[in-house]
């Protein structure tokens, strides 16, 4: 297994799909990385030479991925909480942040229903 950005990349998958195992890299970015490294998208990771894997590592290194990206997202949410702005309050209360309705629905964010005790 090749190791890129601290993640073991699955050998048996195509390069584009394997790169999506890294947090912060989706299909579009994976295709761009493969193109920049000069690697065909349909080549499996186990068929790549060590030099090609190093090129992939260099290309992935240009982006914020994995732990750094998770930390950045967490700090952004923490900043909103500290500011006390509307979005921060919604995060604090565990409600939808982007204007979705909450009278019905929003169960994913709110969690399971709590029964009313009489």
Swiss-Prot record:
Cellular component per GO, a single term: small ribosomal subunit
Q: Which GO terms describe its molecular function?
A: rRNA binding; structural constituent of ribosome; tRNA binding
Key word Disulfide bond present = no
Q: Which domain of life is it from?
A: Bacteria
Q: What does this protein do?
A: Located at the top of the head of the 30S subunit, it contacts several helices of the 16S rRNA. In the 70S ribosome it contacts the 23S rRNA (bridge B1a) and protein L5 of the 50S subunit (bridge B1b), connecting the 2 subunits; these bridges are implicated in subunit movement. Contacts the tRNAs in the A and P-sites.
Regarding protein family, the annotation reads:
Belongs to the universal ribosomal protein uS13 family.
Protein name per its UniProtKB record = Small ribosomal subunit protein uS13
User: Which species expresses this protein natively?
Assistant: Histophilus somni (strain 129Pt)
């Amino acid at each position: 297994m090749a190791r890129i950005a601290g993640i073991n990349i699955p050998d048996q998958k195509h390069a584009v799909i394997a790169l999506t195992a890294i947090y912060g890299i989706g299909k579009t970015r994976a295709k761009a990385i493969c193109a920049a490294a000069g690697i065909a998208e349909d080549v499996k990771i186990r068929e790549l030479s060590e030099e090609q894997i190093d090129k992939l590592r260099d290309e992935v290194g240009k982006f914020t991925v994995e732990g750094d990206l998770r930390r950045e997202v967490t700090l952004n949410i923490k900043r909103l909480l500290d500011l006390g702005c509307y979005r921060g309050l919604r995060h604090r209360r565990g409600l939808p942040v982007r204007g979705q309705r909450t009278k019905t629905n929003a169960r994913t964010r709110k969690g399971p229903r709590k029964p009313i005790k009489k």
